[in-house]
Amino acid sequence: MAENQNYGTGRRKSSSARVFIKPGSGKIVINQRELDVYFGRETSRMIVRQPLELVELTDKLDLYVTVKGGGISGQAGAIRHGITRALIEYDETLRPALRAAGFVTRDARRVERKKIGLHKARRRPQYSKR
């Protein structure tokens, strides 16, 4: 791709995103589709835009994202994490602001496994006294 671009990898749940940023007009492309087309939910779009709005670079950078795995929420979180890492590579002075907002830390929460003898991870069968 271009010489003056920065890269960041983001992960959340079982999703993984590769984010490339370069100077531009604020266009966000995810898997060859516009942000508004890819994410139907407004909350997911907001999550993706959060790091850019925080550092006020929304209309100064173009983003090219490839994301795979997981669901809508996990993918949005992975993209946010990737954008954050790419922004830090772009300008290291943005790190404290992004850290304070909690975007730099990888959310390590995963789905808890189902246990035998239980309905789900923690849901027990109904107790019958008699």
Curated annotation (Swiss-Prot):
Function: This protein is strongly recognized by antisera raised against H.somnus. This protein complements an E.coli rpsI mutation.
Keyword Hydrolase: no
Entries under Gene3D superfamilies matching the protein: 3.30.230.10
Any single Gene Ontology cellular-component annotation: cytosolic small ribosomal subunit
Subunit structure: Part of the 30S ribosomal subunit.
Source organism per UniProt: Histophilus somni
NCBIfam families the UniProt entry points to: PRK00132.1 (NF001099)
Family: Belongs to the universal ribosomal protein uS9 family.
Keywords from the named record: Ribonucleoprotein, Ribosomal protein
Protein name from the UniProt record: Small ribosomal subunit protein uS9
Family matches, as InterPro entries: Ribosomal_Su5_D2-typ_SF, Ribosomal_uS9, Ribosomal_uS9_bac/plastid, Ribosomal_uS9_CS, Ribsml_uS5_D2-typ_fold_subgr
GO BP of this protein: translation
GO terms, molecular function: RNA binding; structural constituent of ribosome
HAMAP family: Ribosomal_uS9_B
Database matches in Pfam families: Ribosomal_S9
